[in-house]
């Protein structure tokens, strides 16, 4: 089992560890400072990002990994050998971080809309519930997530209006 550790936004690391708590290779040892590795299935998009973005360890890079999230590298039958391709560079980590953010926001937006329109729960209360569930309290401002959600809703509504106006032409 080859692992890779890198730094991402703290709230995304908290989200990933709760979201994939059933996919942890080793439960956290209270006496160890190392993080448990998340072992993703090949049906999850981030698995493929890890596989495609892993490169051989550069000779000038330190072997001491630092960061706030650890993954078990994919070990497909065909393709890259994780014993050789075991390094995620800074630019690759940013790409993976963006994929995690997209996954988190998709889940958040679906949660907010479902709670509002199926259960009558206000967006603010749903946002608090989501942030608490994923241990992101104090790591991210709920207001910034809410503003991003409102921008997304506005964009979707404008696209819908545009598509409807094109149909009538």
Locate each region found by the language model.
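Conserved small/polar residues in nucleotide/adenosyl-binding loops
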Residues: 167-169
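Long, low-complexity interaction regions most often at the N-terminus
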Residues: 1-88
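Short, charged amphipathic recognition helices of the HTH superfamily
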Residues: 114-134
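Positively charged, polyanion-binding regions of nucleic-acid-associated proteins
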Residues: 99-118
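Short, basic interhelical loop/turn and adjoining N-cap
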Residues: 131-144
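Charge-rich, solvent-exposed alpha-helical interaction surfaces
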Residues: 49, 107, 111, 126-130, ...
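Short, basic alpha-helical nucleic acid-contact segments in DNA-binding proteins
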Residues: 148-161
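Basic, short loop/linker segments at the boundary and entry of helix-turn-helix/winged-helix-like folds
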Residues: 86-105
